[in-house]
Amino acid sequence: MPIGFWSVILGAMCVISCGEKQKRSFNAFDTYLQFYQEVNDSLSKNPRYVCAEAQKRMTATTDSTTYYHYVMLLAKAYMFRSDMDSAAVCMNQADAYCHRNAPTPQISDLYADIYNMRGNVLARQALVDSAVICFSKALTYRLNGDRKEV
């Protein structure tokens, strides 16, 4: 067989294998988004269920950023359970992850979720001025992220 034929085959295999890595990462986050849409209404009605399901899915994901989106979903469920200490721990874990990573649109989206949650917690504590500052930061991060529609 000619060398050109094998070069084409090898090149095609490289392109396919690189494409799958991107697809796997996308699928992990896509799975999170689908789960989030399914349980969004349950957050206020049945936060214990959301906590249990989010914890199960956290252990199954292989993408770090997706893992911390699950952590933030867990924080929301804790907030609805009025477990503000656990919510704060989750927010701090996600914040530490963001600080360790280079700024990207995905990290900006995660920061937006963190500051939005902090704003919600502060608003529940009647700390309105501090909540407004957090909501403003959340908006700034959201505009730098991929998920502007959220």
Segments the model singles out, each with a brief description of its role:
Residues 1-5:
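Positively charged n-region of N-terminal signal peptides that target proteins for export
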